[in-house]
């Protein structure tokens, strides 16, 4: 991507604000401070592993409240799915294109650091 000519700081701020107000898929997901930590933890779970919010919180090193705050986002973006008729509610990593792409991105990033 080529560098664009210098912009006026106010224009750059307006562009940034516009992106934040209408985020693309990646920004929509990662604009939340704890979501990358949750996704990183989810990507290290064994396939098919079911978990509660408390178990995910312990695995990720965050509070249960943090997991509760972002559960709807993780469900909405097909990263996790709820196990029907589970009590307490249980979740698992979704078998979705989003998760597949996250695994591939994670692997590529890990490989680039070797």
Placement of each model-derived feature along the sequence:
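Short, cationic-aromatic polyanion-contact patches
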Residues: 27-36, 52, 85-107
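Short alpha-helical segments that sit at the start of domains
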Residues: 10-39
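Short, hydrophobic-biased segments on the C-terminal half of alpha helices
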Residues: 71-72
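General nucleic-acid-binding
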Residues: 1-9
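Short acidic, hydrophobic short linear motifs in intrinsically disordered regions
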Residues: 47-58
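Short coil turns linking two alpha-helices in DNA-binding domains
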Residues: 27-28, 63-68
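A short, conserved structural fragment
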Residues: 75-85
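Short helix-to-turn junction characteristic of helix-turn-helix DNA-binding domains
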Residues: 42-46
């Amino acid at each position: 991507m080529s560098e664009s000519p210098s912009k006026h700081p106010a224009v750059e701020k307006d562009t940034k604000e516009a992106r934040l107000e209408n985020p693309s898929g990646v920004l929509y997901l990662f604009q939340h401070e704890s979501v990358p930590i949750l996704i990183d933890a989810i990507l290290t779970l064994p396939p098919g592993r079911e978990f509660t919010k408390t178990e995910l919180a312990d695995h990720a090193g965050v509070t249960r409240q943090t997991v509760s705050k972002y559960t709807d986002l993780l469900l909405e973006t097909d990263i996790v799915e709820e196990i029907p008729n589970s009590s307490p509610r249980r979740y698992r990593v979704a078998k979705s294109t989003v998760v597949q792409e996250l695994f591939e991105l994670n692997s590529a990033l890990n490989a680039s650091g070797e």
